[in-house]
């Protein structure tokens, strides 16, 4: 499930980092089982809905380091840039304007790269 949502390159990089860190290796294994093996794999919500909920939760929690990867995942799952924008704007009412503004800034490069790639122009990532 993790590879399906986040993509091979992200997962390969994260697994290599976890393998190189004996202190947090067990925690990473636990987090992956709970997140991808139990939560994202449950019935009842489709992956697009789970992805939008994740963007909201990360925005409310101020977890900007995870937002870009999950925006990229949302786009991979067929969520449109407009749906991402509306999700972040909706979250602003609950997370606060500064948190939402920071979320927009964190997500903008991923959405821009996606739109650029869809338009046929070379994809540019910062």
What positions do the PLM features span?
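Substrate/cofactor-recognition hotspot
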Residues: 51, 97-98
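Short alpha-helical scaffolding segments that buttress acidic/His motifs in well-ordered protein cores
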Residues: 31-35, 52-59, 87-92
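Mid-chain, well-packed structural core segment of small domains
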Residues: 52, 56-85
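Acidic, glycine/proline-rich low-complexity segments that act as flexible tails and inter-domain linkers
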Residues: 1-47, 76, 102-126
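Short Asp/Glu-rich motifs
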Residues: 93-94, 111
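Gly/Ser/Thr-rich beta-alpha loop segments that engage phosphate groups in nucleotides
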Residues: 9, 64, 98
């Amino acid at each position: 499930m993790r590879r399906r949502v986040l993509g091979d390159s992200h997962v390969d990089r994260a697994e290599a980092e976890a393998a190189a860190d004996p202190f947090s290796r067990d925690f990473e294994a636990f987090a992956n089982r709970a997140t991808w093996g139990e939560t994202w794999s449950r019935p009842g919500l489709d992956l697009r809905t789970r992805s939008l909920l994740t963007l909201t939760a990360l925005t409310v929690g101020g977890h900007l380091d995870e937002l870009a990867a999950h925006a990229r995942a949302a786009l991979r799952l067929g969520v449109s840039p407009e749906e991402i924008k509306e999700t972040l704007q909706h979250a602003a009412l609950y997370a606060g304007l500064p948190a939402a503004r920071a979320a927009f800034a964190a997500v903008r490069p991923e959405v821009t790269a996606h739109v650029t790639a869809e338009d046929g122009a070379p994809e540019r990532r910062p």
